[in-house]
């Protein structure tokens, strides 16, 4: 059987890629006491370290962990759309810290498990009117930006 080569996404726009960034975890193992009180950070540049938030919102260097992952996919020329999957209580918080962008960004609620959140992201992608132009999907955990 001969392997069929599938072209990879590139800058020519022949195959678009969607990024699903999964950030719906509450990070209870990383928290002391397992309790969070969402702060209303209004930008990636806020000086709070954010330990009262899930770890994807903790500061790493000059911005939250999730911002590092988001920025990478946002800058990548093959990424046509980004779907951010966030725990329901943090959707407003995420919306407040997102920078303005030219790429379509879709913010949706995640599920009880990582698998449920990935499924929610894929369902949201399938519902986009131009999803037939997406040839690849990159699924990334926001809490692992490096």
Model-derived features: positions:
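Conserved donor nucleotide-binding strand/loop of the catalytic core
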Residues: 100-114
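Acidic helix N-cap motif at the loop->helix transition within catalytic regions
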Residues: 91-97
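Conserved beta-loop-beta/alpha segment of the NTase-like Rossmann-fold superfamily
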Residues: 112-146
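N-terminal glycine-rich phosphate-binding loop and ensuing alpha1 helix
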Residues: 15-89, 105
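Short helix-capping segments at alpha-helix termini
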Residues: 77-78, 99-104, 130-131
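Short glycine-rich anion-binding loops that position phosphate/pyrophosphate groups of nucleotides
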Residues: 25-28, 88-90, 112-113, 142-145
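Hydrophobic C-terminal alpha-helix "anchor/cap" residues
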Residues: 73-74, 98, 125
